[in-house]
């Protein structure tokens, strides 16, 4: 995908939208469902970034957008809370390099900056798209121990899905 986003963008994002919808609608065996990403972040961040960067043709963007609109208007997709691990693009880039996954080696800092800006506009400034739930922001530039402390301070909110 990262090597040829123009070719694989529509294919991957169609599959992501389908799997995210399936994940949202699957029967829950626990009182809380935690998801790394959602059908909303797939559309508002990753599809939007592909389109804005010129790597997704307008017709592909229109088809994905129409499907997304139909899904969100006709199927209940409840979201109780969004936990935003807010981190700078530079920190994310450093962590990608440390993680050393082969498929992530070609991800440029500029890509992470674009993704970061879309998240900030959506979840912090609330200037781009509807936010379907309250947002809990946890600073994630710090080391893991500080992040764990932030999680523990907010554990009740996160696990109960209660309002922030």
Please identify what each model-predicted range represents.
Residues 39-41, 87-91, 142-144:
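Conserved nucleotide-binding/hydrolysis micro-motifs of P-loop NTPases
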Residues 35, 81-83, 136-138:
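Hydrophobic/aromatic beta-strand patches that form the interior of the parallel beta-sheet core
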Residues 93-164:
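NTP-dependent small-molecule kinase module
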Residues 1-66:
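ATP-dependent small-molecule kinase phosphotransfer cores
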Residues 28-29, 75-78, 129-133:
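Short helix-terminating capping/connector loops at secondary-structure junctions
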Residues 44-118:
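A glycine- and Lys/Arg-enriched "phosphate-lid" helix/loop adjacent to the NTP-binding pocket
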Residues 23, 67-74, 121-126, 161:
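A generic secondary-structure signal
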């Amino acid at each position: 995908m990262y090597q040829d986003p123009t070719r694989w963008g529509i294919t991957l994002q169609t599959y992501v939208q389908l799997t995210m919808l399936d994940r949202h609608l699957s029967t829950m065996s626990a009182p809380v469902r935690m998801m790394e990403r959602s059908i909303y972040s797939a559309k508002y961040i990753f599809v939007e970034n592909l389109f804005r960067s010129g790597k997704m043709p307008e017709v592909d963007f229109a088809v994905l957008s129409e499907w997304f609109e139909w899904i969100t208007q006709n199927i209940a997709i409840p979201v109780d809370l969004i936990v935003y691990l807010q981190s700078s693009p530079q920190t994310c880039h450093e962590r990608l390099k440390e993680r050393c996954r082969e498929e992530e080696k070609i991800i440029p800092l500029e890509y992470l900056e674009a993704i970061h800006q879309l998240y900030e506009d959506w979840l912090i400034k609330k200037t781009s798209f509807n936010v379907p739930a309250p947002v809990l922001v946890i600073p994630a530039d710090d080391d893991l121990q500080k992040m764990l402390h932030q999680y523990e301070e907010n554990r009740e909110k996160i696990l109960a899905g209660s309002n922030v």
